[in-house]
Each structure stands twice: as C-alpha cells, then as structure tokens.
Amino acid sequence: MADYNAQTTTFDNLNIFTSSSATYTKNTDIFLKSGKHGYPKRGTPESAGFDLKADLTKTVTIQPNETVMISTGLYLELPENICALILPRSGLSYKHGITVANAPGLVDPDYRGEIKVLLRNEGNIQYVVEDGDRIAQLLFTPFFAPSFVTVEELSNTTRNVGGFGSTNLK
C-alpha cells in the first residue's frame, strides 16, 4: 500500500525514505565527522553502498590468510532505527581475494567511535592497502527491535523444521 504522506530527505547524496507509518521517522539525518578523505560516496547514482576509504599514515600489507583492522577516519551518528552494514567491495573480492572478515560488519545507532574495517586476505598473494584506497562499502538500512512473546509451541508450516539444504538445490 502506498503511503502518500511519505517524504524523501537528501543529505550528501543519501536519500532516506520517511513515512508517517514507519518506526524510523523520528530522525532522517545521518551526521558524520570525516577525516581527510571526506564523506563516503557512491560509485554511481543508483549504487546502494557508499565506498569507505582507508585512512592510513603508512601502507598496510595483508598476507594470505591474515586479517587486519583498517581505519577509515569516519564517525557516524545514526538515527534511532537505522544501522549501517559494512560489506565487501565485489571487485576487491573477485580480483584480489580481499573481503570483510566479519561481513556484514554492523554499526549500531548508538556507536560513536571510528568506523574501522576488518579486511581479510583470502587470496594466495599479499595485498597492499594504501591511504585513500576504497576498501569496503557502507549500506544504511532500517531495522526493527521487536518485542518477544514466549509461547509453548510455534505454528506449523509446510517447511516446519527443515533447514540446511532441506529444500534441495534443484
């Protein structure tokens, strides 16, 4: 159903949809304090993720099967019901085997520290990260904090308890 009272707020090329029926309408701005590389930018106007850049004083070499924490120099203040997910960049993963170790990394709305990225080298050769390299993506998304209701039994479904391949591959 369409919400005809919905609005879109633009902040540094970030469009946030707000609706009177949604739970995340209290705030629509995302405040940031950025380092020398400025605020995160999207690769194209339709990109969902905002590129995070390495904020380094010297290059970092990631050996195969090694995980390192990379600074971004970025600090965020997120609205109450919006979180940010730190995701790998597909080209970095495909071409070099570099991924986000704890993907998706989660930035909670009450976190005020620097956004850092755990990069992992899944490749066979070392990889060098330089200052200003685009190392990951940041995806903003609303989330819901439900109330839990304890019950004796859950309702039955066709699937029921089947999991981990129970629906087959073909």
Spans of features found by a protein language model:
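DUTPase catalytic domain/fold
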Residues: 1-170
